[in-house]
């Protein structure tokens, strides 16, 4: 259902009502010629770890809008143009709550149907979208791209080969960082993406470095780091917790055939209680290719747009 004209955008501040006191910076992507006198489905697009709305989340939101869907990309609390201290906090529970906070705002828009809300995300934003759907039944359909369950990422490594117990040292590192913070010694930083190409442990992590630290995808609001104290919140986190019971919404889980972290997409599919769930594999693509590279992105968008249009087609779906 492509539109003939480019979508329009509107930057909005979202005052959260969740007790954390942050203001989320968001951009609403509207299909060209949207009838604001009627109500429409909307999709909340969550950024990757340390990513901002001007990067891959914004790219997907824009393309979904070009395919007729209202889409909202945003900066996580404590990151980008959103407020909150300490800066670059990556607390997975708050990242998940951000999605529900954006939904609180989106359903107040006169042209959005409260009962036709979808969620999608890229990398750990996909994991957070899954977790939000487990917690928040207002989400009626979920799409994921290059899934990352941030707890798995940090505990078990890129390919899932590291035992949980072997991540205990990172809990200790996070605890030490909190001691430093409490003592006024400053907030220690921890890389979310390799700081240098030579720090990468595989080809996909080289691509991750390239995306966040070169003109390919870099943005001044996305330094590719987080607070080290975040480790105490990440290591024990599971984005798929209770998916076997509460993740009942329709799911479309997309990964590249060459994605070394594809096991997390497969796990989400296997654990979900949903009876309407599908895997879509993009031939030849790795994890980072689905952030921005063509023809992969347009292939993914075509799948997502069709999925959301169908699953969010009826009020009260």
List each language-model region with its residue ranges.
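N-terminal cap/lid segment of alpha/beta-hydrolase-fold proteins
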Residues: 2-38
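Alpha/beta-hydrolase active-site loop
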Residues: 56, 89-110
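Conserved alpha/beta-hydrolase
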Residues: 63-83
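Short beta-strand/loop motif that positions the catalytic acidic residue
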Residues: 246-247, 253-255
């Amino acid at each position: 259902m492509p539109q003939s004209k480019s979508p329009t955008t509107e930057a909005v501040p979202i005052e959260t009502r969740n007790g954390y006191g942050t203001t989320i910076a968001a951009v609403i992507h509207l299909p060209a010629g949207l009838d604001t006198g009627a109500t429409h489905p909307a999709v909340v697009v969550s950024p990757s770890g340390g990513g901002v709305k001007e990067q891959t989340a914004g790219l997907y939101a824009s393309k979904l809008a070009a395919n007729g869907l209202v889409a909202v990309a945003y900066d996580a609390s404590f990151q980008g143009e959103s407020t909150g201290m300490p800066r670059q906090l990556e607390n997975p529970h708050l990242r998940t709550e951000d999605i529900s906070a954006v939904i609180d705002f989106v359903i107040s828009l006169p042209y959005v149907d409260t009962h036709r809300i979808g969620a999608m995300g890229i990398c750990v934003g996909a994991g957070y979208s899954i977790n939000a759907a487990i917690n928040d039944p207002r989400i009626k359909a979920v799409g994921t791209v290059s899934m990352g369950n941030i707890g798995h990422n940090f505990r078990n490594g890129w390919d899932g080969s590291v035992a949980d117990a072997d991540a205990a040292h990172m809990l200790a590192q996070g605890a030490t960082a909190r001691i430093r913070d409490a003592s006024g010694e400053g907030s220690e930083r921890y890389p979310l993406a390799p700081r240098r190409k030579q720090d990468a442990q595989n080809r996909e992590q080289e691509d991750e470095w390239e995306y966040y630290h070169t003109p390919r995808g870099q943005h001044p609001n996305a330094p590719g780091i987080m607070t080290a104290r975040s480790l105490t919140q990440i290591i024990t986190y599971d984005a798929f917790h209770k998916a076997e019971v509460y993740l009942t919404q329709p799911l479309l889980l997309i990964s590249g055939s060459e994605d070394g972290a594809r096991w997390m997409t497969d796990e989400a599919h296997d654990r979900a209680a949903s009876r309407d769930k599908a895997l879509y594999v993009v031939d030849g693509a790795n994890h980072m290719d689905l952030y921005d590279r063509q023809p992969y992105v347009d292939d993914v968008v075509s799948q997502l747009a069709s999925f959301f249009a169908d699953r969010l087609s009826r009020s009260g779906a």
